[in-house]
């Protein structure tokens, strides 16, 4: 079975108060897994979710069979991102959540808002509050998992696309070089 929890403040969990740290997000996902009485599981995370899964492995790595890190890195304040997180935070405050939700998600797709499945992101962002976006940006900015990479013993698949404008090759290569049992695709 597949369980895809929506982090507090996002998607179907938009009414729940959002969290402002990657560690707190990891703990809430682990709580969800524990409530479902799942002892061992495969784990996948994309972008900020990739930071969350790295933190989950740090907290409870013995419960994780295999790890998939998709378009993510080990440094939350993402080097060479299409714009710095500080700029994203500043623009969120100036432009508001509606404009930010129109501006940033298209960057996640090669064909922007014209991409076949873009509507899924667009729909998920509809209920996201400015506070949730602010908390998420700050959570990423303040997180750094670089020191823990060597401790990730789980078999790890790293997936990255060469058109990614958030995470450059140096970020994913850092994951691949420092996670002992990893493979980059």
Regions found by a protein language model. Give the residues of each.
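Conserved alpha/beta-hydrolase "acid-adjacent" motif
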Residues: 165-171
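Gly/Ala-rich beta-loop-alpha elbow adjacent to hydrolase catalytic centers
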Residues: 45-49, 53
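Flexible "cap/lid" loop of the alpha/beta hydrolase fold
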Residues: 54-59, 64-95, 99
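Short beta-strand/loop motif that positions the catalytic acidic residue
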Residues: 152, 158-160, 164
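Active-site loop/oxyanion-hole signature of alpha/beta-hydrolase fold enzymes
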Residues: 1-44
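Conserved alpha/beta-hydrolase catalytic His-Asp/Glu region
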Residues: 77-83, 94-151
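Core-facing hydrophobic residues within beta-strands of well-ordered domains
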Residues: 64-65, 179-182
């Amino acid at each position: 079975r597949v369980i895809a929890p929506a982090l507090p403040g996002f998607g179907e969990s938009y009414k729940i108060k959002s969290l402002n740290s990657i560690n707190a997000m990891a703990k809430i996902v682990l709580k969800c897994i524990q409530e479902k009485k799942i002892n061992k599981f495969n784990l996948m995370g994309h972008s900020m979710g990739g930071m969350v899964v790295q933190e989950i492995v740090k907290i409870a790595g013995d419960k994780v069979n295999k790890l998939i890190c998709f378009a993510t890195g080990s440094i939350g304040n993402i080097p060479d991102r299409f714009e710095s997180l500080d700029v994203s935070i500043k623009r969120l405050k100036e432009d508001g959540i509606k404009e930010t939700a129109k501006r940033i998600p298209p960057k996640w797709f090669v064909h922007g808002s014209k991409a076949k499945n873009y509507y899924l992101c667009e729909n998920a962002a509809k209920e996201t509050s400015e506070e949730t976006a602010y908390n998420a940006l700050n959570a990423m900015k303040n997180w750094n998992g670089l020191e823990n990479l060597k401790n990730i013993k789980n078999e790890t698949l790293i997936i990255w696309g060469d058109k990614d404008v958030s995470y450059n090759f140096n970020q994913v290569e850092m994951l691949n070089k420092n996670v002992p049992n990893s493979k980059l695709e």
